[in-house]
């Protein structure tokens, strides 16, 4: 039996293709807002970081009443680094909306998430968005989407997907690119007619897979998932099967509070039926992947296999001379608790304690983006710590050392193609496809993940800021040999103190600086970048020696070049193997692992002699 009054659908799109904006318009036209209610753009991006970066990190749930049918909408992250979120969310729905930019076409992350949806047998509605862009190329994009579906072995039914043409910003959709729409009615109607209603076996014992965890300081953990079968009433006895320990006996609990999603919030309910997406609170240490079921019929549900991490970083307690000055949480215990707490929400994250060290932890994730989001989130919460440069995780396959390979798509101006191909070639990248798109060129590469470390800044320089680049994990392949991570060295502070104009003026002749005057520095702190490959020590605290012969006002004013300000991602890309990033709520400071100049020289030259 199917619950015809219900549809569960997820939206798949690449970063910045308008996914959250489309959900905003669906909420408006679905009557979630009162007519006089002030609305915020991109309401589904509820987290500060999401709003700032314009990306969705955590999958969100909402629901719209369209006629007498309730449509549960799940807004998924568009970045492959958050693939752990994407994969388990797809288990909650019966179909997907594939949102594609009318100019950019399908991107690598779109491919990644779509392949997972097709494997699960989901039906797909293709929505070509931003049709009002002056550089739109709708017909080529339609062909690219069909090619992508063929590449991913879509079934004949999935290949025959309906196509809609939309401007999410204007809140319009139509069945033809030549006939402008007036509202999103075509999209709502297509969801009802094409996405199957969820199976609803009400007579069987209750069963639900936990696909997401929310947290509220008043009620604790909230388990979110789709009811697979049966009915659950408030205060009914339930059993919880532990996903991480399948042999452990099921834990008894009670369904204290239940909610369903309505608009932007949750509404308390007294009964949950099969097919609906609900939230349950009152179950202590429940985690993602657990099965909640009736006590007299304990049957764990299979959990979607989450792709393994491909990259790791070491998080450790800050041991710089400025340690403990700016953070609220600085101890190894606090750092450990916070990292392990994150694994409860993010199933694709792995945290392990470093052997022989009580204050360092290896954190493995799906990419630089997911790890940098974790660092920035912890920083805003008041944590102070230090991190190593990212490292790829190697595997041994058939006795050979293998490394993660990324599929990279770069959209660049035609005159910049040579520089991009040359740089990526030197980083062991193989060009596999080259497609002209108007006055631009779309390049596709297979490149080792480590070959992309530190490349994004070079890419923006080589394309004069006009290039678009995106990559996604493709596969593991035999190790491609050594690679120079960085062609530049660091300018390293020689002493502890405060930077002054005279010291900076002399230092800027050796390279580009990251700091201006009046900044507190310590010995071993990185204050700039040197164009040569070796590090150079500089004294940015050096003051000018005054003599009686010289009048103070007769000196020529010192002209300082404005310092380069690096973002968190740029700092992580910049780090060499013997460097660390100190992260505090107020500052990001790059430093050498060995701070003392003499000890560092001894260690370096000692290494060369061996």
Task: Indicate where each model-derived feature is located.
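Long insertion/accessory domains within large nucleic-acid-processing enzymes
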Residues: 261, 266-269, 402, 447, ...
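P-loop NTPase switch module centered on the Walker A-proximal segment
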Residues: 1-100, 104, 144, 213
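Helix N-cap motif at beta-to-alpha junctions
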Residues: 231, 284-285, 365-371, 414-417, ...
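Conserved nucleotide-binding/hydrolysis modules and their immediate coupling elements
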Residues: 207-313, 323-325, 336, 488, ...
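Canonical P-loop GTPase G-domain recognition
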Residues: 123, 133-196
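Short glycine/threonine-rich beta-strand-turn micro-motifs
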Residues: 167, 355-370
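A short, contiguous, amphipathic alpha-helix enriched in charged residues
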Residues: 320-343, 557, 561
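Interdomain boundary/hinge elements
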Residues: 39-42, 126, 152-164, 198-209, ...
